[in-house]
Design a protein with these regions (language model features):
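Catalytic cores and adjacent flexible loops of soluble metabolic enzymes
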Residues: 1-371
């Protein structure tokens, strides 16, 4: 059983459009031991109409008079920025990931820079044309499921299955999506190439709306690897997700919660990121394989902690064993206490001093041994 939890340190737009800050975030994620650093790739003109309203959390954390278009345009990373950041991540030994929000950005990531894994954000899960192009461009997909019903997740997976298993000349149709989803080839492609992330799309996410049990629902419904994209304060909900079996954890982080920008307040700082990685690794190791058996370190303690049958007082050879002259005491390398009732009423074959281990040879049946 693989105990390694894949941790994505989500830089998102917390670089505020500053290349040096973005590079520093890569350093922080690498030093923390995260598996990947993830950014967001977009062109404002392709993503947001100029009259699109801000989300409530964006209004709370940014200039109220500024449009959503103007807000995100300041957070764009250029093609040159991407080139520098990908090289820096490679130098630091951490995987570079990014979420594309438009076709231009998808092409940039997969064709220009050769990214094999694409993260699909919750907001794009009903964007069927985009999903299809992602399936045809990416080797692997991480799909966030915030704001989704189970039916919407299945619909998105159907589009991905179609894209994975048909030639680019195939004409997209809903019926064909569904056929691809239920086909053996489609299911195999989904299992091999897709990871689902449970998510609550609110910043920060209220604890009573997290619903970690939905990870189990996703796993049972679709038979795919499942993880958790965490927008709650702190790291404890991420750790709870790891304990519930999440194979991937995605968590927003920032260099400073007090920086201006839409996501800083809902992000953890570097010390918390380090703690998240360390404790996730420890929990992953602690999960084990589920087989109940003594561990390697426990074997040396068995005889120390367990008990054996011993003489409660001097017992003469030929004397009858009774409840008064038998007792169970440590160490546990002698006659098992499970043989207690078999010995009662039997005669001692030798003389026993007080606290002396009762010989296994006393047992007529010798059914149980402590070894």
């Amino acid at each position: 059983m693989n105990s390694h939890v894949y941790i994505i340190a989500e830089a998102g737009v917390n670089h505020n459009g500053d290349l040096d800050r973005a590079k520093q975030m890569i350093d922080v994620a690498a030093d923390a031991g995260a598996d990947a650093i993830k950014f967001q790739t977009f062109r404002a003109e392709y993503v947001v109409s100029r009259n699109a309203p801000k989300a409530e959390y964006q209004i709370r954390t940014t200039d109220r008079t500024e449009s959503q278009f103007d807000m995100i345009r300041k957070l764009e990373l250029t093609e040159t920025h991407h080139e520098v950041l990908i090289a820096h991540a490679k130098m630091r030994g951490i995987t570079f990931l990014s979420t594309p929000f438009d076709e231009h950005s998808l092409h940039l990531l997969t064709t220009r820079f050769g990214l094999q894994t694409i993260k699909i954000p919750s907001g794009e899960i009903t964007n069927a044309p985009f999903l299809l192009n992602i399936a045809r461009a990416a080797q692997r997909v991480i799909l966030s499921t915030g704001m989704c019903t189970l039916a919407e997740v299945e619909a998105a997976l159907s589009v991905l299955a179609f894209g994975f298993t048909t030639p680019t000349t195939a004409i997209p149709q809903r019926e064909k999506f569904e056929q691809s989803f239920i086909s053996e080839a489609g299911q195999r492609a989904l299992r091999d190439r897709v990871t689902l992330l449970h998510c609550t799309t609110e910043y920060p996410a209220p604890f009573d709306e997290v619903n970690l049990r939905a990870m189990d629902t996703l796993a049972v419904a679709f038979g795919l690897p499942v993880g958790y994209s965490d927008h709650t304060p702190g790291i404890h909900i991420s750790l709870a997700a790891v304990a519930r079996g999440a194979q991937v954890i995605e968590k927003h982080f920032t260099l400073d919660n007090n920086l201006p920008g839409p996501d800083h307040k809902a992000s953890i700082e570097p010390d918390e990121l380090r703690a998240l990685v360390r404790q996730s690794r420890e929990i992953g190791q602690a999960m084990g394989d589920g087989i109940k058996r003594p561990t390697a370190s426990e074997w040396k303690n068995r005889n120390i902690a367990r008990k054996s049958l011993v003489a409660a007082k001097i017992i003469q050879a030929g004397e009858i064993f009774t409840q008064e002259n038998l007792i169970c005491k440590r160490p546990g390398n002698g006659n098992s206490p499970f043989n207690y009732w078999d010995l009662i009423g039997e005669s001692a074959v030798i003389k026993y001093e007080s606290d002396q281990l009762i010989l296994l040879e006393q047992n007529k049946k010798r059914t149980y041994s402590n070894e």
